[in-house]
């Protein structure tokens, strides 16, 4: 069951769902808007001949901070990581689905490649997988709305929510755009 605006506000007001900073105007009929932070991870294309998910490639990306009032320019075909301005704390009985904003999608901005699902128990900032499918560069401004998070009530709380020690939750507690930790799946 997807939470309605009323259910989202109730979950936040009761402390069941954590969102910080929380802006009540971001609550939509069946989702909550999410904003872009000022940090991006850009790929260092000249450092490697290819990306190898089995290897830890520490300098594959570099962190870039956009100064106040400036924009990050995402070029056609470019792929970077960004993150939400908001920090989330999902309880064991709520899961989330990140989607892009329709108005930005119509300009060619994709907010995630494959990782749009947010597990119950997740705590941290959500990483965006941003790409520009248009033929022109797109200006991305810190604090602009770039996505929406729909929340789903599960049939029962997860027995082992994300962040439980046995799961090896690689991205629990992440702050800012977090580079891939796919190499940990090969250990």
UniProtKB/Swiss-Prot annotation:
Catalytic activity, EC: 3.5.4.30
One of the record's GO molecular function terms: dCTP deaminase (dUMP-forming) activity
Catalytic activity: dCTP + 2 H2O = dUMP + NH4(+) + diphosphate
Binding site for dCTP: 101-106, 119, 148, 162, 174
Pathways involved: Pyrimidine metabolism; dUMP biosynthesis; dUMP from dCTP: step 1/1
Residues annotated as site: Important for bifunctional activity: 116-117
Biological process (GO), any one: dUTP biosynthetic process
Stored Gene3D superfamilies: 2.70.40.10
Keywords for the protein's UniProt record, in alphabetical order: Hydrolase, Nucleotide metabolism, Nucleotide-binding
Residues the record marks as active site: 129
Known role: Bifunctional enzyme that catalyzes both the deamination of dCTP to dUTP and the hydrolysis of dUTP to dUMP without releasing the toxic dUTP intermediate.
Family under the similarity heading: Belongs to the dCTP deaminase family.
Subunit structure: Homotrimer.
Name of the protein in question: dCTP deaminase, dUMP-forming
Organism: Corynebacterium kroppenstedtii (strain DSM 44385 / JCM 11950 / CIP 105744 / CCUG 35717)
Gene: dcd
């Amino acid at each position: 069951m997807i939470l309605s605006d009323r259910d989202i506000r109730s979950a936040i007001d009761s402390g069941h769902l954590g969102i910080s900073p929380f802006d009540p105007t971001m609550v939509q009929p069946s989702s909550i808007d999410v904003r872009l932070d000022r940090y991006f991870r850009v790929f260092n294309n000249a450092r490697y001949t290819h990306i190898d998910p089995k290897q830890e490639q520490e300098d594959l990306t570099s962190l870039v901070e956009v100064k106040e009032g400036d924009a990050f320019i995402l070029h056609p075909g470019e792929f970077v990581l960004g993150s939400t301005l908001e920090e989330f704390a999902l309880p064991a009985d709520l899961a989330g689905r990140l989607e892009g904003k329709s108005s930005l999608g119509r300009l060619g901005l994709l907010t995630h490649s494959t990782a749009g699902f947010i597990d119950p128990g997740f705590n941290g900032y959500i990483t965006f997988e941003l790409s520009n499918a248009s033929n022109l560069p797109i200006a991305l401004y810190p604090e602009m709305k770039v996505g929406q998070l729909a929340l789903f009530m599960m049939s029962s709380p997860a027995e082992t929510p994300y962040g439980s020690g046995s799961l090896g939750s690689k991205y629990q507690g992440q702050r800012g755009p977090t580079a891939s930790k796919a190499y940990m799946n090969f250990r």
